[in-house]
Structures are given as structure tokens and as C-alpha cells.
Regions:
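Surface-exposed strand-loop-strand hairpins of Gram-negative outer-membrane beta-barrel proteins
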Residues: 41-60, 398-404
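Bacterial Sec-dependent N-terminal signal peptides
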Residues: 1-34, 564
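Hydrophobic, small-residue-rich alpha-helical packing segments that form membrane-like cores
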Residues: 140-221, 228-233
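Short glycine/proline- and aromatic-enriched beta-strand/turn motifs that initiate or cap beta-hairpins
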Residues: 26-53, 374-376
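Short loop/turn motifs that connect adjacent beta-strands in outer-membrane beta-barrel proteins
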Residues: 24-33, 69-76, 108-112, 116, ...
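Outer membrane beta-barrel
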Residues: 68-165, 192-194, 282-308, 482
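Exposed, low-structure sequence patches enriched in small/polar residues
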Residues: 38, 193-197, 226-564
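Long, low-hydrophobicity, solvent-exposed regions enriched in small/turn-prone and acidic residues
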Residues: 55-57, 61-70, 77
Length: 564
């Protein structure tokens, strides 16, 4: 961690201690202490059959401990992290290893304003131009270290202003990120709207990145004029009436030449192409029925606080949500889609319906059915002429794009149908079918289109008040990549403390390898301890459209979670 960041953290720590002491002495105001501990450990073993490597350390761990102090007017908190010998997923990530207290903050909150100093997380709108958050399963913590002011000057109006430097593992990026957001809740101004169940929220945001120029050469002789300031803007409107809700949002980002990816066979690194994203999302819900319709177009919306960032999980200022169904079953999540910020058209539709009890389809206990469809396509791109020095796109605007026109490639598509049915007082059955097209070249860099059909059965039988048995059977059929997969799981729960799980994922298409797991879980109050042994397949772990590569591994695992 740099000297500047250490000094900032020291100032915040002293401020937190002083303000909390003042709050404690102010009229007997009580201070509440909450926190959590999370520790995930593996004792790795080499397994050449699945390319599970050996490590210099006998054990690897990601361990976190959070503590937060809250009072009537002052809050403060800190997080300790020990990832000096991190889990295999993060072991080779440049800059990830370390230990210390990288996150500390103090917050003053009153009726009409809040002030935060230190590390903080924030999101403007849907996150198109600003979203800082923590996702430990991916190793993401892109918090800002600085200050944030939230003001509520009048009823229905919220104004935010912030500035800081972004965390990159155990350091801070050199650029400054600043921004402002205003949100108007018109229903709080007009009493008649709320009385009729009508709500309208309008929002606008601005984000600025200031980053000193880098020496980027073209053809070995020409230096690009890199913009030190990049601005981004966002406007949005959210309307709600009864069970109907519609959100429209548009964001624009200025020219931000940066390290890029090769798309359509051409490298678009360091092009001067402004970005934009437009989204329309509509939902309707009432008892027993919900409908979702979404469309989104994005173009050149990668926005990072480090121009030459090579990590796929670090330095992101913004976030583009995925328009695909979140999958929790092992084989349904085998080929997850990663949002492509360089450009995509994305659509999603979902219908969920509950058949009532004592009807022909609902039966004695009723039945839930959910149908989901997602489609992601490339945007139109017409490459412009290259520069005069080496013929590449560097230093040019790269390409033109007609807004409503598709490109030539499908990136992803899936169709899901899920049925949840209670067959008796003690037996529940969930069935799922998924048809998927996954462009492996776009997401992973090579492999072509993978078309798969996935079948899943999930059954739960309640033996008695304390004993429950659950089982899963899954089958993935495909002629591409590694071919067919089979998966089985048995889980026995003894309330209130114990759970025993065994599972196996088997590739019957190419490798004929088994990825077996055995787990014993003990829970008591706020404590949860899990001991396991087995293999983990190499693949991708995704959350919210952000993905990272997971290496294969084998060994003894131990996880502990505690909340207080």
C-alpha cells in the first residue's frame, strides 16, 4: 500500500476513534458493535489427472474479519484481510496477495445529510457509470478511498457528491474518480400521486476520471494525445403504478482510449470512440403472476480507473448488469455468460405463474412454473480506416455503428423452464430444462459455439421434523467442447445443527474424469463450520455478468463463518 493511502487511512482511523468517543459521551448515546468473520481454507493436493497443481504452502486461505460500530449520529468500521497465501482461484492474480486493514471508514449521519470519510461503496442508478462493490467469490473490491457527502435539502430530493482513489487489491490507482448524483422522487411532492399508488423517480449522474497521460506510441514514432479527463453522464426515469414498473436509463461516456480486446478480428486498443448504453426494463406482478421484459444496448462502455489494466476483475468504475438468468445448479452454470462491455445487444423475458391449489394443473398443493429466455448479440460495427503510421485502429475512432442494427455474431442464448411441485406433505420436486447457445470464443477467447441441452431434477423428502433428504440429478448433452456431463448430489440434514453432502460431476464426453466432493456442515447460532474433501473442475465463476477463471484443485477444505 502506498504512503498516501496509509496516511489517508491513519487520518480516517483517528477521526473514527475521536468521533465515536464523542458520540459515546453525548447524552448516553449507545454504541452497537456488529461484525463478521469469514475464513476459507484449502490444504491442496496435486492431481495431474485434472491438472490440479502443487503449491509451495501447505495451506491456502482467504480470511476476512469485519467490525462496525454504530450510534445515533456516528458510525465507523474496518475490515482485516489475510490473503497472503490465497485460494487457488486468486493465487496467480498479480497484486492480490497481502494482509492488513485495507478498508476503514467513519460516517456521520443526520436528518438532512450524511458524510463518509474513508473507504466506501456507491452506485449511481443501475451502475452504468459508477458502481463500487465487494464480491469476495470473484476477488473484487473496487471501493473508493476518499469522501462522500449525501444531502437531502428538501423532501423528495437526494444529492450525492464524492471523490476518491480506487482500490486495486493492496494499492490505490493513481487516477482520481469524482462524481455527483441527484434523484427526485416526484410522488413525495405531489400527494395525489402517492394516494393513487403512482410513483415516479427521476435521476441524473455525472462521473469524472482524472488520469495523467501515458506514453502510447503508434508505429514507434507517433505519440498519441491521451485525454487526462474522461467524463460520463447518466439519466434515468423509473415509473411505478400498482404492480407495473418501468425503468428507462441512458448513459454516455467520453473518449477513453485504453487497452482493449480484439473483436471481429481487429484490435480496438487505444481508439477514440465514445461509449453509450441504453436500457429499458419493464415488470408486472400480482398474486401468482410476474412478467419481466428487458432490452439493453451497450457500446464501448469499459470504464476503468487504470488505463492499462490487464486484470479482468480490477479497477472497474462501472458495471453493466447481465441480462441472463442466474443459475445455481452445477451443470446449468457450467457455461456462464460474461457481459461484454465493448458492445452487445441483450434481451431477457421471463414469465412466472403459480397454478392454484385444487385445480387441474395445480393439484392438491399448487404448482409454480417459470419460463425465461435470454439472447445476447453483437452490435453493428463498420471498421474505419486505420492510422497512417502502422495501419492499426490506434489513434482513430475505430468504427461506426448503427444503433438498432445487429452485428453478425450471436454471443449467447438460453431458454429455461422450471417447474416446482409439491407432491405430498413431505415430498417436493423441482424440474428444469435449459437449452443453451454459448459463444466460447467471445467469452473465453476460443472454442466456437457450444450448444447444449440440460435436464435437472431436484427432489426433497422430509423424513421427520428433524431429518430431510435432498437429491439432485443433472445431465448436460452437447457435441461440442468436452461433450456430455452428469452430476449427482445427496444431502442429508439433521436439524438444527448438521448437514452431510456428497456429490460427483462426471464428464462422459472426453476426459472421463470424476469431480467428487464430500462435505460436513455444522451450524450453531451465529457459527457455521464446514469440512470437505474433493476435486474442483477448472472453469468460470460468474456473478452479475462478471467472470473470472477458476483453476482445477483438489484437497481438504475448511470454511468458517461467524456473525455477531
Amino acid at each position: 500500500m502506498s504512503h498516501t493511502s496509509r496516511r489517508l487511512l491513519c487520518v480516517v482511523a483517528v477521526s473514527a476513534a475521536t468521533l465515536c468517543a464523542a458520540a459515546q459521551d453525548d447524552g448516553g448515546n449507545k454504541i452497537s458493535v456488529t461484525g463478521s468473520v469469514q475464513s476459507d481454507i484449502i490444504i491442496p493436493q496435486e492431481d495431474k489427472a485434472i491438472n490440479a497443481r502443487d503449491y509451495d504452502e501447505w495451506a491456502l486461505t482467504n480470511t476476512y474479519a469485519d467490525v462496525a460500530l454504530t450510534s445515533k449520529y456516528i458510525d465507523a468500521g474496518a475490515r482485516f484481510e489475510f490473503v497472503k497465501f490465497p485460494l487457488p482461484t486468486f493465487y496467480d492474480e498479480d497484486g492480490f496477495k497481502g494482509w492488513g486493514v485495507p478498508n476503514i471508514y467513519v460516517k456521520a449521519h443526520f436528518k438532512s445529510w450524511d458524510l463518509t470519510l474513508g473507504n466506501f461503496y456507491e452506485q449511481f442508478g443501475s451502475g452504468f457509470i459508477l458502481r463500487t462493490y465487494e464480491e469476495r467469490t470473484l476477488g473484487i473490491d473496487n471501493s473508493l478511498l476518499g469522501g462522500r457527502l449525501v444531502v437531502r435539502p428538501v423532501k423528495g430530493v437526494t444529492v450525492k457528491a464524492l471523490a476518491g482513489k480506487q482500490r486495486r487489491f493492496w494499492d490505490l490507482n493513481k487516477s482520481w474518480v469524482s462524481g455527483a448524483d441527484v434523484e427526485l422522487n416526484l410522488d413525495q411532492w405531489f400527494k395525489g400521486m402517492a394516494d393513487k399508488g403512482t410513483y415516479l423517480t427521476l435521476g441524473a449522474s455525472w462521473v469524472n476520471k482524472y488520469e495523467k497521460e501515458d506514453d502510447i506510441m503508434v508505429g514507434g514514432t507517433h505519440k498519441l494525445n491521451m485525454p487526462s479527463t474522461v467524463n460520463a453522464f447518466d439519466v434515468r426515469a423509473n415509473f411505478q403504478k400498482g404492480g407495473f414498473n418501468i425503468l428507462a436509463e441512458y448513459a454516455w461516456k467520453g473518449e477513453d482510449p485504453a487497452q482493449g480486446n480484439a473483436l471481429t478480428g481487429r484490435d480496438y486498443s487505444y481508439i477514440y470512440h465514445p461509449g453509450n448504453v441504453a436500457m429499458l426494463s419493464a415488470t408486472y406482478s400480482k398474486k401468482g403472476l410476474s412478467v419481466l421484459l428487458q432490452a439493453k444496448r451497450s457500446d464501448a462502455m469499459s470504464f476503468k480507473s487504470k488505463r492499462n489494466e490487464t486484470s479482468g476483475i480490477a479497477s472497474a468504475i462501472n458495471h453493466l448488469p447481465a441480462f441472463t438468468m442466474d443459475q445455481t445448479y452445477a451443470l446449468a452454470a457450467l457455461y456462464p455468460y460474461a457481459t461484454q462491455p465493448d458492445g452487445e445487444w441483450a434481451y431477457q423475458a421471463e414469465l412466472a405463474y403459480r397454478f392454484k391449489r385444487n385445480t387441474a394443473l395445480g393439484g392438491k398443493y399448487g404448482m409454480n412454473v417459470k419460463v425465461n429466455f435470454s439472447h445476447v448479440h453483437s452490435i453493428d460495427r463498420r471498421d474505419h480506416a486505420g492510422n497512417e503510421f502502422d495501419g492499426t485502429a490506434k489513434g482513430t475512432d475505430g468504427y461506426g455503428s448503427a444503433f438498432f442494427k445487429w452485428g453478425d455474431e450471436m454471443y449467447y442464448q438460453d431458454f429455461n423452464i422450471q417447474i416446482e411441485k409439491r407432491l405430498s406433505r413431505s415430498f417436493n420436486l423441482n424440474l428444469m430444462y435449459m437449452n443453451q447457445f454459448y459463444n466460447q470464443t467471445i467469452v473465453e477467447g476460443e472454442g466456437g459455439m457450444v450448444h447444449s441441452d440440460i435436464f435437472i431434477a431436484d427432489a426433497k423428502y422430509r423424513i421427520n421434523r428433524k431429518l430431510t433428504l435432498r437429491g439432485e440429478l443433472q445431465y448436460l448433452s452437447t457435441d461440442e467442447d468436452d461433450g456430455d456431463w452428469l452430476y449427482g448430489l445427496l444431502e442429508l440434514s439433521f436439524l438444527p445443527h448438521w448437514m452431510f453432502t456428497i456429490s460427483d460431476m462426471y464428464n462422459s464426453g472426453v476426459t472421463n474424469q470424476h469431480y467428487y466432493q464430500g462435505l460436513v456442515t455444522f451450524s450453531h447460532g451465529s457459527h457455521r463450520l464446514q469440512l470437505g474433501y474433493g476435486r474442483t473442475r477448472e472453469g468460470w465463476n460468474c456473478a452479475g455478468g462478471v467472470c473470472r477463471r477458476v483453476p482445477s484443485s483438489k484437497g481438504v477444505t475448511l470454511s468458517y463463518n461467524y456473525n455477531f
